[in-house]
Swiss-Prot record:
Pfam families hit by this protein: Peptidase_A8 (PF01252)
Bilayer-crossing regions: 8-28, 61-81, 93-113, 128-148
Annotated source species: Bartonella henselae (strain ATCC 49882 / DSM 28221 / CCUG 30454 / Houston 1)
Gene name of the record: lspA
Name listed for the protein in its UniProt record: Lipoprotein signal peptidase
Family: Belongs to the peptidase A8 family.
Protein keywords: Aspartyl protease, Cell inner membrane, Cell membrane, Hydrolase, Membrane, Protease, Transmembrane, Transmembrane helix
Length: 163
């Protein structure tokens, strides 16, 4: 990590956590728990509480156990961000999104003992995806960003070796 990159990292965290928490606040105060608000033929806002992690995994863990697990993962992610080469900007951006999303969900878990989820994708009455939130979306987009940069690096290395 360089001093030059830290302000961008901090700004990214402030934006991801701030947007996530603002939307969750709006959902909590405008959509009753367990109520679905259709937006599009395949998308609804559906206010639920998730006591686990993604897809309700680890929902049998204690409240403090999940907080501890999240903190350990955050420390590891911060270490990865800090030790990622400066020229790997997409990877660094990906880690920023992942860390911001994890912090957003950690705030919920500390304050409410659960995570506020509200995004529901579905196809008619045939398929319903797990309800999730914007923090989960940031985490997913961060992983995708890292995978893209790794694939591009791999393709570049492969083409360099074959020449």
């Amino acid at each position: 990590m360089t001093r030059k990159s830290f302000p961008f990292f901090l700004l990214g965290l402030i934006l991801t956590v701030g947007i996530d928490q603002a939307v969750k606040y709006w959902v909590m105060h405008n959509i009753p728990l367990g109520t679905e608000t259709p937006l599009l033929p395949f998308l609804s806002l559906y206010h639920v509480r998730n006591s686990g992690i993604a897809f309700s995994f680890f929902s049998s863990f204690s409240h403090w156990g999940l907080i501890f697990l999240t903190l350990i993962i955050l420390i590891f992610l911060l270490w990865l961000w800090k030790n990622t080469q400066y020229n790997k900007s997409l990877t660094r951006f990906g880690f920023t999104l992942i860390i911001g999303g994890a912090i957003g969900n950690l705030i919920d878990r500390i304050c409410f003992y659960y995570v506020i989820d509200y995004i529901l994708f579905y196809i008619n009455d045939v398929f319903y995806f797990a309800v999730f939130n914007l923090a989960d979306t940031f985490i997913t987009l961060g992983v995708i960003a890292i995978i893209i940069e790794e694939l591009l690096s791999w393709i570049k290395r492969k083409s360099t070796f074959s020449e």
